[in-house]
Design a protein with these regions (language model features):
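Short, charged/polar surface micro-motifs in flexible loops or helix N-caps
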Residues: 13, 36-39, 297-300, 346-349
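Short small-residue beta-strand/loop micro-motif enriched in glycine and branched aliphatics
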Residues: 72-73, 300-304, 351-352
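Short, hydrophobic beta-strand segments
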Residues: 108-113, 303-306, 356-360
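A glycine-rich phosphate-binding loop feature that marks nucleotide/adenosyl-phosphate handling sites
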Residues: 147-150, 230-231, 286-297, 336-347, ...
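Acidic, metal-coordinating catalytic segment for phosphate/diphosphate chemistry
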Residues: 310-405
Length: 405
């Protein structure tokens, strides 16, 4: 028996949350951005009127203003988005215990074993969810219904806003095959360009490629994309009971040549801290501690950790702490073979806290950095991991592979 999977995607989530406090702006073009006073800031989200003007997520403010001179800019409020995300997922949890969040504004639901309790009609259940989210929170969602996770996500992207799309056994080729290959889950800009060089521009064209050819071209990802394009995805929806609590998030890299200079160590720590912070944000987690590990050329391993005075998922804060630990730990110029950065003492986003600064300067700076890193996440989600990085020298890391712990 086929599974029944729903993918629920909040429409223009950041912008929609902000407009709850500004209902008078609902019919006007509005965008959420890091710093509305900076021309070179990045658009984090936009509402439908702004979208109709051609405004795009991850483009610069000045470019968006050129397209839409009347664009209204609002600053982000990340704690607000986290609160709504938690409430919305709680609604999903009333229909199945198999709810798997995918970022702050998307979730998969496996209703295979619970659908009969709610009428037995998957489309009707999707419409019920859309109605509840709109009535209870003033937000809209699009829902994809299918027999696997990949097609359910394609369905939620297929019609927006506030729509339900069913991709079933009898129509999936008609809907899926004409779509650009870049619409497929985990196909970033670099993968799309690589496939394009071989004449593969649609999911239908991808489905006709041999699995062996794709694996030769792209490694394990090629085999995965072959399965996705041919309706063979069987990945489970992991509910909270199936997901082991994440106790730490770490990344490491073993260098092809030993590091002996501090600027090389800085580059390595920064790259690792960026990867750790990005994963924390994706999981909706904050860390309350940081650990740095060093393996020298004699394969001796040293580590040091510290507890933070507040929880964070920001690269800058993790990186600053990791650099201090590395500086204390490393006995220069002892050659370094491996570096690792690990986030410890993890808490859910809604449980995080920050000590208050009486002048408010810490909170202001935190919001600005939240905006910067959210913008980077948006760029990477749209164009791929390598589209943007922090301004550190990475000559020593060229071609190095970052490993997840």
């Amino acid at each position: 028996m086929d599974r029944i999977i729903l993918h629920c995607d909040c429409n223009c989530f950041y912008a929609s949350c902000e407009l709850l406090s500004h209902p008078d702006l609902r019919q006007l073009p509005v965008a959420v951005c890091g710093d509305p006073t900076e021309r070179h800031g990045i658009i984090l989200a936009k509402n439908e009127p702004a979208k109709r003007c051609g405004v795009k997520t991850a483009e610069t403010i000045w470019k968006a203003k050129q397209k839409c001179p009347g664009l209204i800019l609002l600053p982000p409020h990340h704690r607000l988005y986290a609160e709504y995300s938690k409430k919305i997922n709680a609604v999903y949890g009333e229909y199945t215990d198999l709810v798997e969040p995918f970022g702050i504004d998307e979730s998969w639901l496996d209703v295979t074993n619970s659908l009969h309790l709610f009428g037995g009609d998957a489309r009707a259940l999707a419409d019920t969810l859309r109605g509840r989210i709109k009535r209870e929170f003033g937000l809209t969602i699009s829902v994809g219904v299918s027999f696997n996770k990949v097609f359910a996500k394609l369905g939620s992207d297929y019609k927006k806003p506030d729509a339900t799309t069913v991709i079933a056994r009898d129509n999936w080729r008609d809907i899926v095959f004409p779509l650009p290959v870049g619409d497929l889950l985990f196909v970033g800009r670099s993968a799309q360009e690589l496939l394009g060089r071989y004449g593969v521009r649609t999911i239908g064209e991808l489905s006709k490629c041999s699995e062996e050819m794709l694996e030769t071209l792209m490694g394990k990802m090629g085999s995965q994309l072959y399965r996705y394009a041919n309706s063979l995805d069987d990945s489970p929806v992991r509910g909270a009971a199936d997901r082991e609590p994440i106790k730490s998030v770490g990344n490491s890299t073993t260098f092809r040549r030993d590091l002996t200079r501090w600027d090389e160590v800085q580059s390595g720590i920064s790259l690792l801290s960026d990867s750790v912070a990005m994963r924390l944000r994706r999981y909706g987690l904050y860390c309350g501690g940081v650990q740095v590990g060093i393996k020298n050329s004699r394969f001796q391993v040293f580590s040091r950790q510290t507890t933070l005075d507040h929880s964070t998922h920001l690269m800058r804060e993790i990186n600053d702490t990791a650099l201090r630990l590395a500086k204390d730990l490393w006995k220069a110029p002892d050659p370094i073979r491996l570096l690792s950065v690990t986030a410890l003492h993890l808490t859910e986003e809604a449980q995080s806290y920050r000590q208050l600064d009486l002048l408010g300067t810490d909170d202001t700076q935190q919001e600005k950095q939240e905006a910067v890193e959210s913008a980077m996440d948006a760029l990477r989600k749209k164009f791929g991991r390598g589209v943007i990085s922090y301004g550190v020298s990475e000559d020593s890391l060229s071609g190095e592979k970052i490993e997840r712990d």
